[in-house]
């Protein structure tokens, strides 16, 4: 063994790592953002570990709603951004296309649904819901029966503000429940079962707010909001990250305007280069003299007239507004020129590129409305219509819904000639279909082909 060990060498047991070295290696493999230093301590002071619902308590959401509504009501940019978002998302409203094998039944259902949507002003209510989603954080619509509707189907949507969907008893620990989150009851699988709707708005002008509420089944309530975190039950305003920026924009504009007005208020100032008790005539300090237009003015001996150098608005004022508006619009996936209503600094290519991201966000938003709002409305409408009008084919009456698709307004191209050429190329190369091309414009290809045949 001694000879073999000498020839081949003897394996030596590896020495255990020193604790100090191992610890240094762990520290080197850490994350800089996880370290707390004297420099970043104040920046991360408000970071917490709260759940989505614990962070968005009723009081927090109430404050955010009030401030978001205040900015939307008093800030022209905020109002325009929210209104533009609703107009671009909903437009003139969605149009239904039924896809069963019965062409006559399809046409009848589509016509009746379009007439009902016009009778209840469905596009207008959807636009209001989209604005409420941006400003209030969520939108609610009760599926009710309205006997005054000029339609055989009496289904209607009654919009309810987020303030009115709450449970006053949740503020009492003895009545709180883990399966309930302010205004909503959930089952064991996380599905909403009931909504608590106050009988009077908390901010109503007609009497004092009441704590009485109705338990509305989830089947009769449409609730839409942007889910940013797992386990989130209620929505917060989509413009929340921009609220402080809106305030800064208005404060800066008022400060610039105030400085310019202050400088313009003084037509001129008398000053002298003579020393104190010098040869200049003595005049009353802080005295004011009204000047006449197009008149010659004589100065006291030794005195000169000068004007205040108006430095406001500064050359950086416009740049500041552009940067802050760009940051404001980013939380809504909206490009600067859409938020500002000004494309002066854009060229053709940059405008197209910015709008690609925006239009993709609009498609996602429309898909969410189809899934969470329109499909539920359609299913309820079909149930009512099958009883009132007998429109649904017998083979589909027991189904949960009918095959269908939704069409929305298309987006106008900046250069229609180029778009028409590209469309012809796609059709000639068989990389698209008439259905897809008409869908881009928000049109039903079958209706358009029939119309072309008539012409």
Which residue ranges define each predicted feature?
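Short coil/turn segments at secondary-structure boundaries
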Residues: 128-129, 144, 259-267, 339-343, ...
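N-terminal-proximal low-complexity accessory segments that begin disordered
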Residues: 1-94
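Generic structural marker for isolated residues within well-ordered, non-membrane alpha-helices
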Residues: 113, 325, 434
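Acidic/polar, glycine-anchored loop/turn motif associated with catalytic or activation segments
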Residues: 190, 328, 437
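Surface-exposed loop-to-helix/strand elements on domain peripheries
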Residues: 99-110, 297-415
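Charged substrate- and nucleic-acid-binding regions of tRNA-handling and nucleotidyl-transfer enzymes
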Residues: 413-455
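Extended, charged amphipathic alpha-helical segments
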Residues: 221-353, 395-397
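Structured, mid-chain assembly/scaffold modules that mediate subunit interfaces
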Residues: 69-227, 426
């Amino acid at each position: 063994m001694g000879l073999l060990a000498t020839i081949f060498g003897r394996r030596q047991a590896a020495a255990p790592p020193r604790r100090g070295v191992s610890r240094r290696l762990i520290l080197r493999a850490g994350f800089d953002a996880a370290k707390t230093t004297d420099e970043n301590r104040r920046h991360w002071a408000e970071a917490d570990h709260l759940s989505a619902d614990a962070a968005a308590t009723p009081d927090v959401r109430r404050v955010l709603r009030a401030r978001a509504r205040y900015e939307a009501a008093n800030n022209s940019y905020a109002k325009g951004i929210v209104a533009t978002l609703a107009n671009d998302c909903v437009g003139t409203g969605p149009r239904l296309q039924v896809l069963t094998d019965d062409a006559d039944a399809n046409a009848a259902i589509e016509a009746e649904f379009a007439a009902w949507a016009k009778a209840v002003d469905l596009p207008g209510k959807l636009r209001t819901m989209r604005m409420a989603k941006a400003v209030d954080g969520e939108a609610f619509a009760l599926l009710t029966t309205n006997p005054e509707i000029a339609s055989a189907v009496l289904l209607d949507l009654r919009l309810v503000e987020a303030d009115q969907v709450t449970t006053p008893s949740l503020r009492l620990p003895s009545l709180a429940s883990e399966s309930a989150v302010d205004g909503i009851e959930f089952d064991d699988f996380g599905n909403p079962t009931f909504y608590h709707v106050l009988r009077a708005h908390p901010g109503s002008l007609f009497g004092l707010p009441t704590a009485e509420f109705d338990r509305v089944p989830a089947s009769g309530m449409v609730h839409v909001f942007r889910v940013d975190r797992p386990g989130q039950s209620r929505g917060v305003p989509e413009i929340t990250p921009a609220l402080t920026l809106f305030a800064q924009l208005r404060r800066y504009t008022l400060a610039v305007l105030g400085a310019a007005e202050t400088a313009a208020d003084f037509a001129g100032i008398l000053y002298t280069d003579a020393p104190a008790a010098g040869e200049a005539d003595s005049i009353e300090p802080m005295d004011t003299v009204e000047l006449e237009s197009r008149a010659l003015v004589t100065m006291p001996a030794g005195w000169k007239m000068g004007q205040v150098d108006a430095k406001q608005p500064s050359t950086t004022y416009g740049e500041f507004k552009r940067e802050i508006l760009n940051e404001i619009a980013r939380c809504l996936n909206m490009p600067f020129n859409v938020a500002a209503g000004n494309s002066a600094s854009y060229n053709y290519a940059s405008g197209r590129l910015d709008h690609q991201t925006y239009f993709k966000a609009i498609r996602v938003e429309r898909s969410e409305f189809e899934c969470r709002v329109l499909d539920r409305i359609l299913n309820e409408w079909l149930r009512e219509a099958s009883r009132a009008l007998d429109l649904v084919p017998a083979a589909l009456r027991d189904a949960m819904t009918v095959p269908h698709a939704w069409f929305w307004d298309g987006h106008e191209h900046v250069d229609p000639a180029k778009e028409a050429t590209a469309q012809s190329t796609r059709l000639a190369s068989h990389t698209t279909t008439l259905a897809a091309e008409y869908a881009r414009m928000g049109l039903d290809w079958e209706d358009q082909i029939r119309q072309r045949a008539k012409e």
